[in-house]
UniProtKB/Swiss-Prot annotation:
Name under which the protein is recorded: Photosystem II reaction center protein K
Bilayer-spanning residue ranges: 36-56
Biological process (GO), any one: photosynthesis
GO CC annotation, single: chloroplast thylakoid membrane
Keyword terms of this UniProt record: Chloroplast, Membrane, Photosynthesis, Photosystem II, Plastid, Reaction center, Thylakoid, Transmembrane, Transmembrane helix
Length: 61
């Protein structure tokens, strides 16, 4: 469990302090997709939270 936590911390650290992460832009033809692209990194976290809600619904069998 500690290794997973360390991996998550490393990933968050690399995202927050990566200069190329904030300077990347979509081409003009796809500029209308910017709001969707901004939300996309959160989607895996929603699935992770859904797993806990599902387990709570079935009483953590």
């Amino acid at each position: 469990m500690l290794n997973i936590f360390n991996l998550v911390c490393i990933c968050i650290h690399s995202v927050l302090y990566s200069s190329s992460f904030f300077s990347a832009k979509l081409p003009e033809a796809y500029a209308f997709l910017n709001p969707i692209v901004d939300i996309m990194p959160v989607i895996p976290l929603l699935f992770f939270l859904l797993a806990f809600v599902w387990q709570a619904a079935v009483s953590f069998r």
